[in-house]
């Protein structure tokens, strides 16, 4: 049960939908910078996590909140690996432009 003055499930779902929409717009409109693309993908994952926590709290089940910890762990590893690859790519090519990445050579 939620106390008076606390946000409802709908408020959390609207927040999650807004964050997800911003992330989708960031992925589709950004065609230049890989770092912004990675940030938009992380925003998508954050929106999903907010929805999982909201439903978990609403239903009184902790499974969604525990699952969020696993998602955050995978997202942190993905971001670390992505940034490491990006740093190595920048050292070789001196660019982080998305258009330049499609040409990989051995």
Curated annotation (Swiss-Prot):
<feature type="transmembrane region" description="Helical">
    <location>
        <begin position="66"/>
        <end position="86"/>
    </location>
</feature>
<comment type="function">
    <text>NDH-1 shuttles electrons from NADH, via FMN and iron-sulfur (Fe-S) centers, to quinones in the respiratory chain. The immediate electron acceptor for the enzyme in this species is believed to be ubiquinone. Couples the redox reaction to proton translocation (for every two electrons transferred, four hydrogen ions are translocated across the cytoplasmic membrane), and thus conserves the redox energy in a proton gradient.</text>
</comment>
<comment type="subunit">
    <text>NDH-1 is composed of 14 different subunits. Subunits NuoA, H, J, K, L, M, N constitute the membrane sector of the complex.</text>
</comment>
<comment type="similarity">
    <text>Belongs to the complex I subunit 4L family.</text>
</comment>
<dbReference type="InterPro" id="IPR039428">
    <property type="entry name" value="NUOK/Mnh_C1-like"/>
</dbReference>
<keyword id="KW-0472">Membrane</keyword>
<keyword id="KW-0813">Transport</keyword>
<dbReference type="GO" id="GO:0042773">
    <property type="term" value="P:ATP synthesis coupled electron transport"/>
</dbReference>
<dbReference type="Pfam" id="PF00420">
    <property type="entry name" value="Oxidored_q2"/>
</dbReference>
<feature type="transmembrane region" description="Helical">
    <location>
        <begin position="35"/>
        <end position="55"/>
    </location>
</feature>
<keyword id="KW-0830">Ubiquinone</keyword>
<keyword id="KW-1003">Cell membrane</keyword>
<dbReference type="GO" id="GO:0050136">
    <property type="term" value="F:NADH:ubiquinone reductase (non-electrogenic) activity"/>
</dbReference>
<keyword id="KW-1133">Transmembrane helix</keyword>
<keyword id="KW-0997">Cell inner membrane</keyword>
<dbReference type="GO" id="GO:0048038">
    <property type="term" value="F:quinone binding"/>
</dbReference>
<dbReference type="GO" id="GO:0030964">
    <property type="term" value="C:NADH dehydrogenase complex"/>
</dbReference>
<feature type="transmembrane region" description="Helical">
    <location>
        <begin position="9"/>
        <end position="29"/>
    </location>
</feature>
<keyword id="KW-0874">Quinone</keyword>
<protein>
    <recommendedName>
        <fullName>NADH-quinone oxidoreductase subunit K</fullName>
        <ecNumber>7.1.1.-</ecNumber>
    </recommendedName>
</protein>
<keyword id="KW-0812">Transmembrane</keyword>
<keyword id="KW-1278">Translocase</keyword>
<dbReference type="GO" id="GO:0005886">
    <property type="term" value="C:plasma membrane"/>
</dbReference>
<dbReference type="InterPro" id="IPR001133">
    <property type="entry name" value="NADH_UbQ_OxRdtase_chain4L/K"/>
</dbReference>
<keyword id="KW-0520">NAD</keyword>
């Amino acid at each position: 049960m939620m106390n008076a003055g606390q946000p409802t499930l709908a408020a959390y779902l609207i927040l999650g939908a807004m964050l997800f929409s911003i992330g989708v717009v960031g992925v589709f409109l950004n065609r230049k910078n890989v770092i912004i693309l990675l940030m938009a993908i992380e925003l998508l994952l954050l929106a999903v996590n907010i929805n999982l926590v909201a439903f978990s709290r609403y239903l009184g089940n902790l499974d969604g909140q525990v699952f969020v910890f696993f998602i955050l762990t995978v997202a942190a590893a993905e971001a670390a690996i992505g940034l490491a690859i990006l740093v190595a790519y920048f050292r070789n090519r001196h660019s982080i432009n998305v258009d330049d990445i499609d040409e990989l050579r051995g």
